[in-house]
Amino acid sequence: MSPDPFFWYALVLKVAMTATIVVVVSVAAERSGPFIAALPTAASATYIILAVEHPPAFVAAAAIGSMAANAAVAIFALTYAALAQRHGIVLSIAVATLLWFGVAAVLRLVEWTAATALVLNAVVFAFTIPLSARYRDAAVPRNSVRRTRYDIPLRAAAAALVVAVVTTASHWIGSFASGVFAVFPIVLATFVVIVHPRAGGKAAAAVLAHVQPALVGLPLGFLGVHYLAGWIGVWWSFAAGLAITMAWSAVLWLVRRSRLRIA
């Protein structure tokens, strides 16, 4: 046990802040769908804490790790969607999670830059978005995924645990690894753990398949953080990065609405 009481105060603050962010976004996602659900909820909390505990250069470098690891999130979502068509939640989420960790481990073997991380995402999404298209048609019955009193607390607690571990370990694992683990898909994982048993694997897979296009906005947002953190400060860079990500989600939402009107 740490003898420093500040450690425990900081830990409680990390958990409380993360839980609050996840609760707010989860409620918003119920009304707005996967475009809001794909926003970096746990990652946002992680970066706020990293900004408090580390200099701007650390945050800027971590953003490259998050950009690269976003490709692993896309692979995670596709893997789960494919496996959930025929398999249960345990096998589907376990294999997808193990694959995420495998891709994350491989990412550490390369010296990534902002440009190469963007290229990686472009290549990965060129495959994951069209391959996920076949899984988007399954309907998600609203009554089968109606929120219970423990759904959001479960998601908030899981995300808070990941954020607390990553930010505490950031002092030892370095900036790139901190950025990689900041985008570990804990919010998506807990969502499908809740939905899969109630609505079925195909319905849960449809949600993650719809998330794929929205995930494209995350590396763009982290790109803004990377270049702006040292120039205008981390807090303004966070605002810019979030604005970029939300702008991308807004574009997708408008495109979707226009298609529905035409149909």
Task: Enumerate the language-model features and the residues they cover.
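Structural signature of hydrophobic alpha-helical transmembrane segments
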Residues: 5-18, 40-41, 55-73, 114-126, ...
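Alpha-helical transmembrane segments of multipass membrane proteins
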Residues: 21, 72, 76, 80, ...
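Selected transmembrane alpha-helices and immediately adjacent juxtamembrane segments
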Residues: 33, 136-176
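Membrane-interface helix-loop-helix junctions at boundaries between adjacent transmembrane segments
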Residues: 57-68, 75-120
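Transmembrane helical segments that form the transport core of multi-pass membrane transport proteins
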Residues: 161-199, 205
